[in-house]
Amino acid sequence: MSQDDEIVMRDVTSAGICIGDRIGREAASQLDLEEALEASRYASHPYSTHPREWPPLIEVGETWELPSVLIERYNTAGGEGTALCGIFPEIRRAWASVDNSLFLWRFDKRDGQCPEYSGEEQAICAVGLAKCRPGVFVEAIQYLLVLATPVELVLVGVCCTEGPDGRDPYAEISVQPLPDYTISSDGVTMTCVTCTNKGRIFMAGRDGHIYELLYTTGSGWNKRCRKVCLTAGVGSMISRWVVPNVFKFGAVDPVVEMVVDNERQILYARTEEMKLQAYVSGPNGEGPLKKVAEERNLLNQKDLSQGNRQSAVAGRSNKPSIVSISPLSMLESKWLHLVAALSDGRRMYLSTSSSGSGSTISFSGFNNHRQTPNCLKVVSTRPSPPLGVGVGLGFGAASVAGRTQNDDLSMKIETAYYSVGTLVLSDSSPPAMSSLLVVSRDSSVHSQAGSSSGPSSRSSRALREVVSSLPIEGRMLFVADVLPSPDTAATIQSLYSELEYCGVEVSGESYEKACGKLWARSDLSTQHILPRRKIVVFTTMGMMELVFNRPVDILRRLLESNSPRSLLEDFFTRFGVGEAAAMCLMLAARIINFEDLISNIVADKAAEAFEDPRIVGMPQFDGSSGLSNTRTATGGFSMGQVVQEAEPIFSGAHEGLCLCTSRLLFPLWELPVMSKKTSSDTMSEDGVVICRLSTSAMHVLESKIRSLEKFLRSRRNQRRGLYGCVAGLGDVTGSILYGTGSELGATERNMVRNLFGAYSNGGESANKRQRLPYSPAELAATEVRAMECIRQLLLRSAEALFLLQLLSQHHVARLVQELDANLKQALVQLTFHQLVCSEEGDQIATRLISAVMEYYTGSDGRGTVDDISPRLREGCPSYFKESDYKFYLAVERLERAALTSDAEEKENVAREAFSFLSKVPGSADLQTVCKRFEDLRFYEAVVCLPLQKAQALDPAGDAFNDQLDASIREHALAQRKQCYEIIANALRSLASPLASPTLDEASRSQYICQIVHLGVQSTDRAFREYLYKAMIELHLENELLEYGGPDLVPFLQNAGSHSESQVGAVSTGSSPLGHSGTQISSDQAKYFDLLAKYYVSKRQHVLAAHVFLRLAERRAISLGDSPTLERRRDDLSQAVLQAKNASNSDGLVGSAQGVSDSGLLDLLEGKLAVLQFQIKIRDKLEAIASNFESSVAMQDSDQNGQVLDGDSSDDTNLANAANEMAMEVSSELKSVTQLYNEYAVPFELWEICLEMLYFANYSGDADSSIIRETWARLIDQALSQGGIREACAVLKRVGSHIYPGDGVVLPLDVLCLHLERAALERSERIENVRDEDIAKALLAACKGAAEPVLNAYDRLLSNAAVVPSPNLRIRLLRSVLVVLREWAMSVLSDRMGSSPTRSSLILGGSFALENKAALNQGARDKIANAANRYMTEVRRLALPPNKTDGVYAGFKELDESLLSPFSF
């Protein structure tokens, strides 16, 4: 598509708004016939004359003589037999009967055929044609002839056969006798037969009753055909059975005419006495016939007769009578239902509803105005057309002038025919020759309709008709419309069937008959699609075809005949400049259907008239608009109001183009392009999606629209008309013609206002003086700009129709099968306006084209892209662009690659597809395409194509421009991320074995590495970050650390930190202690953890230690996001390990020195120790809470619902407090001071307190109260919980942990005395305390060192004030004996390399003397001296022998063993 023909959607949208408004006004301008008749009551001239200088409005097309065989038969009968005639337009046949013979012949062309049917013996008295009900006869029988004789009713089948070319379905007919479908008339002579569009047959008898003829296939005893009387009561039926009709002498008023309103399901009947009856047959036309109204005095309702009885009798011969009745279609009127033509030329319009009107026509809701018939009343009377006004062929005036003075100048109508707005009267008032008066709607007055109110508006809405008079030979017998051809009818039906404004509702009627109703509308709005109307008149002398010239036909004749310019100007004046220009445009573009082709001369003259400023005018400003806007409602001037700017009035050429375009698009614009077809035999409730319009209808409309667009383009290229006027404006031309400028308004509505006739100069509204914003040249350029927008709209509309035809040819139902439910619903609701003008319509069209391409490029091989793409590129290039062509070529290559087994060829074909797509990255459907590349394992395209599309979507890099608004940046980044997600999905597929079960691990790793390599090489910073996040999410940390780019560390730092300053502390290697305790979420922790692993892998141990420390000390953002203490311990342990590795590493310059200087290792180890205390405190608190809760539960079960005592309540409170403290201590790291003061001491965790005091290197006097009190509380706590054994166990556990100490943390004197006293007290009561328990516990606390324990006992025994009690002293001496023995055994075991247990056996066994030499002499002396000293001390005690002898003997035995001659 060249630049000149390129469609700018902004222009299309602007023109679409303008044309949409025009279409809305077109629909609103259509008046109901009742409103037009009401307005015409106040008009002085309801009839107009056709200009004599113009070509005739109605002309005789052809005349035919009656078939010779018919004339011969009639002459043979001597002119006295029974003869009837009529026309069956449904089968294109005229008919006539002579006695018992029926003749049928073609009335619209001469084919020489006139078949005769004479199967009856009696004369035919009534004839009718009915549609054949389905399922009764064979398919070949389409219609039934209904023949009534005085004695029988006969059905005859009619078979229609199409011609050789297949275009004429009624080329030949044959009649098929049906002998089983003949019944007796029961002596009733039928006067007329009428049939409904659903095949029901009604007959009127001379007895005044209405009958229905029913027929079925027949089964069993049932008759195949029967006659039912619908209007007679029970009494009348019995009377008929008993007394034959010939013996009834009462007055009978037979029905002479019946007509059916198939839209409202009403049957009207007219009797000889001018009585009208109305019957209804149910809402669907299949119910029983029911009389709803009967009116005898219709002529009196409108004062048709005046005066007394005598004058009425005297003037009885002049009283008008009803000549004919005809139903009015709903297209003509919703409130008027029947028109009756009178013998004096007047018309009565009747309604069957008692309610009034008062509604307007709209696009929808047409059926809502149907009301149940309940009466027959005259609503309006139309005066008779004046004699002599019709000048169709110039005979009317002459016929009036030829009458004598005594002749009655009133009309004498013999027969009348009314159909869709046209009335044909046979006037026998002329003395010499009868004439036909044809009354039709005058189209010219519609161009004068205004929007103002008052008398002028009423006059513009009044019904005006033009009268034409034609002479005829003989009498008019029957008139019928010549229906459009089947092809034309099918096209019109498809276009207008769902447009209720036009009322083309088939409802069982043939397309031809239903579409003929459009003639009721103005010729101006339908002449572009409807052919010339034709009627055929059956007279006693032959047949005559009358052709109605449309306004465009008259204009064509004027242009063909080289008429004076004044006639052309008169034509423009009569129809209005806009309407006349529209007709010129139709002729110039050749979009009107004619029987013959439009000559080039006529087309050129029409184009010249369309562009002639002397005829269509020039665009100008409304000089009175600014002034008129200053007037107030009262008619004066308001000095306080701002004078509005003058509005431009475009030329008639622009107005004509708008009218022509809106009428072409009218049946499409606001209606959906698709519909759902449902059938009873399908189980689906959704139905099948099909194109609403037929392919032939869309083709017809497309050709018309393309012809119009082609004409406008040629005038632009040739610089004709206004195009030539604006050609000299230089650079302004480009912006005017192609929309590249920015001066046309900020929004679409403003642009439409500027382009299509509502100007505002903006910014200067304070100036109250009227001003002209544009020069005449600029104003002309603006009109050209507006016309160019409409041209682009036409081109886009033609392309949309072409696309719809293509979709229909490929079966839309099949194409939409794969669409999701939401897209299907959007497609069904999509209007043509949206398809042409909206982005949504463009997207849906793209999706449908994609479905067509998938049909061709599918694996089953229906074709290639080049099989269908040329049609798309030529027919709808704005929907199928060059980029789309390359895209589908790539898709075709992908399909071929998928079917190729050779690996090298597969890769080459895939690379070809990648090459195509790389040229059009912005138009590719990446979701589908990249998935196909994934299946081919061609991951280069999977990575590169989304990155190219991301760049195409955001070429300026708005996502990274901090100078732009945040919403713009976010939108650009969101578009990029949609592309990135495709690459991430490919990674997910590879990372999940379930998604790719056939892929081995080696290949999986290879492809993942390939994607990562390609991604890291990208210059798109946002994508690399997105890739890193996706890899972390997929647990591809190892691959990320191995192949990550140089920006991986900054990415991890930024992702884990809240600010750049925090990242700087870590990245530079400095200690991040100033940031300890920073709030970090679990997601951020992932990045820090990965950063630490990265540092470890790169042997940057100091940085890794800092990151692990930061992870251990982090504070949670939310309560549930807090890491456990065990996790913190793991992180700190890792930090200690990395610090140790750094101190042992010689590879990093300055690392060991940095650790030595900062004491990082000591710091980390100290933090780890404090964390261990914290974990212990938490566990203790949880245990305390659990114990208290168990205690409370046991008390509750024991008390069985009694009120809790105070202790139970305290336990509950303690349990709650312990739980709260446990949760608090688990939330974050605490200092050793906090742990000691806030948790350990309040909950009496004395053991942990001692450990923390030892860890803190607590120093003080030996009598330090804190140490002593803590130990005392710990021992008391143990004693209360488990007695001496528990206290000894605690002493062993705690003492061994903190020994060796400086005597402050482990005060042996205090512990010894405290335990010995407790043991003495408890042994005297209930507890069994062994002598060695305390001594061995003290020895264990000192890690087996006996001397410190012995020294403690020495100090106690030497101070009588401290240990005054003999019992306590003997208790201490027993413990001393245990200490000395243990000391001796430990010395022996050290020398012999045996355990202390075995040493005790040796020392007291048979080998004691032999092994004593192994004892250390120094230790032996100390032990011996102590034993001698304590033996003396035992003797000094004032205690009974039974308490001292054993102790004394022990010391003595020990001493003797040490003093043996075999001593070492």
From Swiss-Prot:
A Pfam family recorded for this sequence: Nucleoporin_C
Primary localization class, coarse: nucleus
InterPro entries: Nucleoporin_Nup133/Nup155_C, Nucleoporin_Nup133/Nup155_N, Nucleoporin_Nup155, Nucleoporin_Nup155_C_1, Nucleoporin_Nup155_C_2, Nucleoporin_Nup155_C_3
Gene3D superfamilies attached to this UniProt entry: 1.20.58.1780, Nucleoporin, helical C-terminal domain, Nucleoporin, helical domain, central subdomain, Nucleoporin, helical domain, N-terminal subdomain
Keyword Acetylation among record annotations: yes
Modification N-acetylserine occurs at: 2
GO CC term (a single one): nucleolus
GO BP terms, alphabetized: mRNA transport; nucleocytoplasmic transport; protein transport
Keywords tagged on the record: Acetylation, mRNA transport, Nuclear pore complex, Nucleus, Protein transport, Translocation, Transport
Compartments where located: Nucleus, Nuclear pore complex
Function noted in UniProt: Major component of the nuclear pore complex (NPC).
Assigned protein family: Belongs to the non-repetitive/WGA-negative nucleoporin family.
Subunit relationships: Part of the nuclear pore complex (NPC). The NPC has an eight-fold symmetrical structure comprising a central transport channel and two rings, the cytoplasmic and nuclear rings, to which eight filaments are attached. The cytoplasmic filaments have loose ends, while the nuclear filaments are joined in a distal ring, forming a nuclear basket. NPCs are highly dynamic in configuration and composition, and can be devided in 3 subcomplexes, the NUP62 subcomplex, the NUP107-160 subcomplex and the NUP93 subcomplex, containing approximately 30 different nucleoporin proteins.
UniProt-recorded name of the protein: Nuclear pore complex protein NUP155
Source organism: Arabidopsis thaliana
